[in-house]
Amino acid sequence: MEVFNLMTNQNKPYGKIASGKRNSKKRYVTYRKTNKRKAQIPPEVKESVRIAFLGGINEIGKNMTLYEYGNDMFLVDCGLAFPDADLPGVDLVIPDFSYVERNADKIKGIIITHGHEDHIGGLAYLLKKVNIPIYATKLTIGLIKGKLEEHRLLNSAKLVEIKPRDNITLGSFNIEMIHVNHSIPDAVGLAIRCPAGVIIQTGDFKIDTTPVDGDMIDLSRFAEYGRKGVLALLSDSTNAERPGYTPSEKSVGDSFENLFRKANKKRIVVATFASNIHRVQQIIDVAYARKRKVAVVGRSLENLVKVGSELGYLNVPQGLLIDINTIKNYADDQLVIITTGSQGEPMSALTKIAFGAHTKVTLSPNDYVIISATPIPGNEKMVGNVVNELMRHGVEVIYEKMYDVHVSGHACQEELKLMIGLVKPKYFIPVHGEQKHLQKHAKLGEAMGIDKKNIYIANIGEKIELCDDKIKLVENVPSGEVYVDGIGVGDVGNIVLNDRKHLSMDGIIIVVATIDSSTGQVVSGPDIVSRGFVYVRENEALMNSARDLACRVIDENYNVKFHDWNAVKSGLRDELSHLMYERTKRRPMILPILMEI
């Protein structure tokens, strides 16, 4: 593993990098790896810059964008998405890297805007295809290291640490990192400069005037670029439907203080997003003030606390954290348990606790559970099931509909309008959202005075060109979804998924028979095995009918001379499927297994 720090003169990074801070008296320092030639003057005739959307458009998750100028390319983010219910057995969904692989020699690196899964979760899979330098802030690098270590890629990775207001040069591009507020520290937006002009990509952001860490979004840099002229703005659309402003993260801390006071003699359990360091910090602060010890449950949360503490993003008083195995040594009013599972995930710690499946935490009526999150669309039923189960155990449960225990990390309408007003782009491209979010954000752009013809709602896979007078669709590049199932990547396609759906709906019937090749007679079987279709002992008449039918089909279709197995198997599938539907109105999968002796 090669890790570079921009403020030292050791381990010089892969591109030209200038480092600077707000209100810093340090000089900007420039490093070059080996190339000592003078910078070439851009030609008078400019090319147009092109953008390819490989993920994060018309969907939530697997964000990935490619920028191209001349023969130079670079990537922004490489995330994952979690599978919908119609993808049985699939663990993760990542972008299609075909276009990236095809242009591997042109790609100068990848910049990661922040450490959420939908922005870093696909990195390990990308690096197995193309090993390019990764540029990210300190915390994001820390989280990426954990991902790469799991895939045994850490030693070969090229990681370059960057900070807000640093500038990096990747071929024809010079990119400045701009600090933004989000639900994880160290998030940045990008000012992307090339001979064609300046493009601002906000990344995930909100405008928090009272951030927990005291570091407000760098609006002055966005405004400065707006004064100089911006060719295009790519802006976060997640909350484009929500009017007003997103509340400050600090307001959740105030809610925690009130709720912890009310809990008094009870044991407090707080479920939140594992990546929300500011939320975890506020829980720790209130627990410390109430003289309670804190235990952490859930692998991802444990990792976040470890990385956040080591890198200085979490301030944990000495002796406050205790091992989950020791919680029985403390009275209920001396404990706070922070856990994963705010989305009701089936294998999460909170779900296991609720259903009595957790080996270390057992519920009691004296527990006080706070779910500090809003259900992601599609997760409402799972969260509801967990809440109901907790309440069946006599546990008092507090969630967002009852109390202000969560705020979003994304900008609402007034913040989005402010960003547009500061940047004043010629072209506006809403990103990071479903179609409804992109459309609503586009309307906000129109309301802020951007010409409708200069607003472009992209589709995944489109490569566009920012021309002098319009945005032009150049081509559609390979894109879409690649499914990760266990250690398999991309080996689960529509055929496999259709089989899984078929099995999940009507089950399977397996027909096993042994045939004498010289006579064509069935010498063993047919045996009928049913899984997920009917309970055999209660349907013996149906199974006997299936056996008789299988014998007849084999006799009629098996040809001693030609041994046409396909005809026999096709006949078995057709006839048995007809029988099963006639008797049960179900269509199980029919799988014939024929052996010849």
Predicted regions and their residues:
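Conserved hydrophobic residues forming the short capping helix/wall of the S-adenosyl-L-methionine
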Residues: 148, 445, 580
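Short glycine-rich phosphate-binding loop at a beta-alpha junction
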Residues: 133, 429, 591-592
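Hard-cation-handling environments
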Residues: 242-372, 376-425, 429-562, 569, ...
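Broad gene-expression machinery/nucleic-acid interaction feature
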Residues: 172, 187-189, 334, 506-510, ...
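Short Gly/Ser/Thr- and Asp/Glu-enriched loop/turn motifs at secondary-structure junctions
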Residues: 163, 459, 586-590
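C-terminal tails and terminal domains of large nucleic-acid-associated
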Residues: 561-597
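Intrinsically disordered, low-complexity RNA-associated tracts
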Residues: 1-43
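His/Asp/Glu-rich metal-coordinating catalytic cores
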Residues: 26-111, 116-330, 348-362, 381-385
